[in-house]
Amino acid sequence: MFTFYWAKTIDTINFAKKFLADGGQIFVGGIAATLVPAEMQAEIGNNVKIHIGLLDKPTDLNKSDSVIIDELPPDYSILEEIDYKYPARNAYFGYTTRGCIRRCSFCAVSTLEPIYKDYVNIQAQLQITENFFGKKQNLLLMDNNVLASEKFPQIVEDIKNCGFGKDSIYILSDEYDLAIKNLRAGFNDRAYIKKIIRLYEELEKKLPEVEAGKFYLAREKNFLLHFITATKEKILEFDSMAHPLFQKYFKQGKRTHYVDFNQGLDARLVTEENMAKLAELNIRPLRIAFDHYEQKGIYEKAI
């Protein structure tokens, strides 16, 4: 949560309150809510419950719930709802550890994730993501200090088991089939109607001129030229025409997998042994954190 989104976030929360049913409850959590809970509570009122910290216990929001929200993968379908192309849209997001062993004065991690957890099994998260949203090219890991983990060798093995070992490649997922599958399942209809309209437009550019004309007219007849007029029912009916064309003209190519420890590695913990383990992965880029100038020598040695 960056400060320049503060007003917009508060407005969104207060807008959501208008739709709260009698006896219902709104929870607000995350970075800003954890760092400045009093300031946020003053803006949104006492009828909204602020959750401080992670949702890493099954009873955090509901005493009878068995789900650990922190271990669930993100809902990648929200990226299909927006026109902006998120730069990291073709990446899995996750953690293999939580927290940090350091307590740097400038850093909020010790407040956000105060207890260092040296292992989070990422394999199940990536499998769920692949089933719902297809394979991603990159693995963007948000660990704050992965090298501090005594289970670092196991973490590397987990990542390799997910297909991100050295020189690993993968076959692109069929975006149209995934979108149709999720639309049939009723999973975020808005997102997948919008995505399928975009895929129609991409397909049309690949078709021979005469076939492209027929496809356009068929879309027009079924009100499938624009997201605002398209309906789920019409898209599912139109699948009998669209599916064979996607199969014929959309080839599932191969790509190289890459891993990015996005928050950087702790230069003080770089050793020959853990660098040898990292070399078993397709790392790009390799980030080493440089947080204190007085540690310049340590940083240079790590490089």
Which residues make up each language-model segment?
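Soluble or luminal CAZymes and related metallo-dependent hydrolases
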Residues: K8-D11, A88, K117-A124, K151-Q154, ...
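A structural signal for short, well-ordered beta-strand segments and their strand-loop junctions
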Residues: F27-G29, K49-G53, F93-Y95, N138-M142, ...
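Canonical Radical SAM [4Fe-4S] cluster-binding loop centered on the CxxxCxxC motif
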Residues: P87-A124, I128, F133-K135, L147
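Conserved SAM/AdoMet-binding glycine-rich loop
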Residues: Q127-I303
